[in-house]
Amino acid sequence: DLTNQSVVQVNRLRTTVALSKGKSSAIRFVHKATGKPLFLVYNRLFNRLPTIAQKPDNVIQFASEDRFYIFDAKYRIQFDREYMAQYGGPGPTTEDVNTMHRYRDAIAIPHPMRPQEYLQGVVVGAVVLFPYPHEDMYRSHRFHKSIGQVEIGGLPFLPGATALVAEKIESLLASEFSDLPSSTQ
């Protein structure tokens, strides 16, 4: 169930989506069967870090303030011959995949009881969303397979090419609510 949000605005008879560059927006849901919260946050700023602030485009935050999965839209695709031979076809740039590693390693949150300490490992995975229409062909790509291995990689995401992202989100939800019978998830 949706409990609150700052994304969709209704003014008189007009509905608008309010995603502003550089500004954070959020939707909060509550899982009916468990009461666990789930957040979808656009432009979440992680700025209380011991090093450099991090700001991925989209963050799905599960159940608490300390568990995140990042979906970061990068509107680039790499398809040079050497890349395709090494990774198995067109896909996200290696630079963008490395950014996902950086997010996972760099994002930490302050420890609730010890102000000088940080909880690490709060980002359980991160994927690049990149423009590519051929999802079935991409399934054999190295950066698709790496998601199942290390939870870092890339997924195609375009209008009409959303199945792999939907599968990933369904998988994340199933693992978060794995203690429930599948009919209540």
What are these regions (language model features)?
Residues 2-185:
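Catalytic core segments in nucleotide and nucleic-acid processing enzymes
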